[in-house]
A protein has these predicted regions:
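Long, low-complexity segments enriched in small/aliphatic residues
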Residues: 1-69
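Long, contiguous, secondary-structure-rich segments that constitute the structural scaffold
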Residues: 63-65, 69-80, 84-199
Length: 199
């Protein structure tokens, strides 16, 4: 339905309890764009100025197939961000970065892009967590799972979905040990399987 004439014709049938409109309703989302600002009217950004979403990625289908060395070699485990946002943070392509908010911290390889909208971040969905607990006060996921950045709050405009596409975060260049390429790290093995002799 893209015009009032069509909406009027559909509404004459009386099939819907609410009238259909030729335009979408707008819901202010939980942790949406407005929440990236400390002061919306003055347009002053807050502590977590970047809005992240979690697209599917060529390397895997959720966590399935993410254990294959060939695809790990072909496709890194990036975080896509706007090139200007990266430059303002001193981040270059290939840098290990920490993505964080009040819920957790995880590491990824930065991939700045000119085509990303400023203030947005793409964190491809579906990696396996690899926790670094060497600092109990600052546990970080070296696997790079986006779930570290969410408390599981459901979307208020589509209640069947967790809010993984409304993550408010900040990204900084990581000053710790750089990430090892996934293909060099070795596969994740099921419990009880010995890594010795595993290709």
């Amino acid at each position: 339905i893209y015009c009032q004439f069509k909406a009027d014709n559909v509404n004459r049938t009386g099939l819907n309890s609410e009238p259909i409109k030729p335009y979408a309703n707008y819901f202010v989302p939980n942790r949406g764009y407005q929440d990236t600002f400390a002061d919306w009217d003055a347009k002053v950004k807050g502590a977590y100025p970047l809005q992240a979403y979690t697209p599917h990625y060529m390397r895997r289908a959720h966590t399935c197939y993410d254990n294959m060395t060939w695809t790990q070699e072909a496709f890194r485990n990036p975080v896509f961000m706007n090139a200007q946002d990266a430059e303002e943070r001193g981040i270059e392509a290939g840098d290990t970065v920490v993505c964080y908010n009040d819920f957790g911290r995880m590491l990824r390889i930065a991939q700045p892009l000119q085509g990303m909208m400023p203030g947005t971040v793409g964190i491809p969905h579906g990696v396996r967590s690899l926790f670094d607990e060497s600092d109990p006060a600052g546990i970080v996921d070296r696997g790079g799972s986006e779930q570290m950045l969410s408390d599981g709050q459901q979307s208020n405009y589509f209640p069947q979905v967790d809010g993984y596409n409304s993550l408010l975060i900040e990204i900084e260049k990581y000053d710790g040990e750089a990430l090892v390429e996934d293909c060099d790290r070795g596969p994740f093995l099921a419990a009880g399987i010995d890594a010795e002799g595993t290709p």
